From Swiss-Prot:
HAMAP family: Ribosomal_uL29. The keyword Cell inner membrane does not apply. Keywords: Ribonucleoprotein, Ribosomal protein. CDD domains: Ribosomal_L29_HIP. Belongs to the universal ribosomal protein uL29 family. The gene is rpmC. This is Large ribosomal subunit protein uL29. GO terms for biological process: translation. The keyword Ribonucleoprotein applies. GO terms for molecular function: structural constituent of ribosome. Gene3D superfamilies: 1.10.287.310. Transmembrane segments: none annotated. It holds the Pfam family Ribosomal_L29.
Length: 68
């Protein structure tokens, strides 16, 4: 997922996606702790996706506040 795709989504969709990504990160941490995680690079990509979504949400909130 790239930033442009995220900017096209509504804030509600972004919040839903953020919750799903955080849940996935939680599950990946448990898999790593129990030794079941095979693709360790997925943790990094999920962590970066969480940051990307949070950044876009902040940008949208700032833009909404600036227009009011």
């Amino acid at each position: 997922m790239n930033a442009q795709e995220l900017r096209d989504k509504t804030p509600d969709e972004l919040r839903d996606q953020l919750a799903a990504l955080k849940k996935e990160a939680f599950n990946l941490r448990f898999q790593q702790a129990t030794g079941q995680l095979e693709n360790t690079a997925r943790m990094r990509s999920v962590r970066r996706d969480v940051a990307r979504v949070a950044t876009i949400l902040t940008e949208k909130a700032a833009a909404a506040a600036a227009t009011e």
